[in-house]
Regions:
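Feature for soluble, non-membrane regions of globular proteins
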Residues: 1-200
């Protein structure tokens, strides 16, 4: 089915006081994400993927080792990734982490802070463009992972609970080359933990 650019669930300037400027959201959502939607729709038109869901397109077109040559996958996966990214952020100080999520993270990582440290390290350590993730694996275990370019947990049968874009366009306007600072700010000020917990 045709991709549709989702509206942001908040105003473009709603995150500005928390470290993500109106300019960043205008470029990132209105231009970058829109380009993935527009290009994806052009590429799937008249193909077997035209009437498939974005999730089916991502899993059906993923080819390990050949992502750079796969335009349909790249645009579909980046559309899916960004739709999640907008959903798990919110205005106001990052909402209090629900007890169930706090408990799950503490049991898995030792503490919520250790999870945040591991997540930030994964994002900072991703060479080049990519994403940092908190995922629920097929066996129900929580893990921190990172992926290159537009690859996402759907490719591996995993459930994405939290994703952070570490492509340079996501942070250069506000943080320049300071990716670690961007990741820390994301975790401490931008994440809507209630939205993350709802994906458990």
């Amino acid at each position: 089915m045709a991709f549709t650019l989702p509206d942001l669930p908040y105003a473009h300037d709603a995150l500005a006081a928390l470290g993500m400027s109106k300019e960043t959201l205008e470029y990132h959502h209105d231009l970058h994400h829109k380009a993935y939607v527009d290009n994806g729709n052009k590429l799937i038109a008249g193909t077997e993927w035209e009437n498939k869901s974005v999730e089916d397109i991502v899993t059906g077109t993923y080819q390990a080792g050949a992502v750079a040559q796969n335009g349909i996958f790249n645009n579909a996966s980046q559309h899916w990734n960004h739709a999640l990214f907008w959903e798990i952020m919110g205005p106001g100080e990052a909402k209090k982490m629900p007890g169930a999520l706090d408990k799950a993270l503490t049991e898995t990582f030792g503490s919520v802070q250790k999870f945040k440290d591991d997540f930030a390290a994964a994002g900072a350590g991703q060479f080049g463009s990519g994403w940092a993730w908190l995922i629920k694996d097929k066996d129900g275990a929580l893990k921190v992972t990172k992926t290159e370019n537009g690859v996402n947990p759907l490719c591996f049968g995993q459930t994405a609970l939290l994703g952070c874009d570490v492509w340079e366009h996501s942070y250069y306007i506000d943080f320049r080359n300071k990716r670690p600072a961007y990741l820390t700010n994301f975790l401490e000020k931008l994440v809507n933990w209630e939205a993350v917990a709802a994906r458990l």
